[in-house]
Regions:
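Sec-dependent signal peptide recognition
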Residues: 2-8
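Short, well-ordered, aromatic-rich surface patches in folded extracellular/luminal domains
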Residues: 5, 16-38, 87-150
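Post-signal-peptide N-terminal segment of Sec-exported extracytoplasmic proteins
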Residues: 38-63
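A short, polar/proline- and glycine-enriched secondary-structure boundary/capping micro-motif
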Residues: 42, 64-71, 129-132
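Residue-level detector of beta-strand structural context in well-folded domains
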Residues: 44-46, 68, 106
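A short, structured loop/turn motif at beta-sheet edges
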Residues: 48-52, 71-79, 110-116
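A short-motif feature that recognizes glycine-rich, charge-decorated loops
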Residues: 57-90
């Protein structure tokens, strides 16, 4: 009986690991979530994947509401990778805030090799993260997106 449980678990483990290899190109390089505030903050989610696809979901106070997709150029993709490579994952904080009560929350998820870093951005953000944020907004404006039906 124990042997059959072991075989089932081993089969599940191997099937999951083979699926992981097949989807490596769809893994996310960077995701950026812009949350709401008391004012008119833009609310959206942007993901840039290793297969160079961009997923955009506009939720509130943005020009494009709904889910969209496009492809990023090799140059822009390399620029994002370069900016991420400048971030010291071991020494960067996970939360940047201040004493202000109505701050616009942004969530930045960075992925590099086998490292992931989730950072909550409110205020007092270091320069290298501001550069990434600036590049994200540039990419949103730069590309034409295809609307995805729900």
């Amino acid at each position: 009986m124990r042997l059959s449980y072991f075989l089932i678990l081993a089969t599940l483990f191997l099937s999951c690991s083979s699926n992981r290899n097949n989807t490596s190109n769809n893994q996310v390089l960077i995701s950026y979530e812009s949350g709401s505030c008391y004012g008119k903050c833009e609310v959206f989610i942007l993901r840039i994947n290793y297969n160079k696809s961009i997923e955009y979901e506009g939720l509130k106070n943005v020009e494009k509401i709904g889910k969209y997709t496009t492809k990023i150029s090799v140059n822009d993709f390399n620029e994002i990778e370069k900016l991420i490579s400048k971030v010291d994952f071991n020494n960067i904080e996970s939360v940047y805030t201040s004493k202000s009560t109505d701050l616009h929350l942004r969530i930045l998820n960075l992925h590099r090799k086998n490292q992931n870093k989730k950072i909550l951005l409110f205020d007092n953000i270091p320069f290298e993260l501001k550069q990434i944020e600036k590049e994200v907004y540039s990419i949103i404006e730069k590309y034409k997106y295809k609307f995805l039906k729900n």
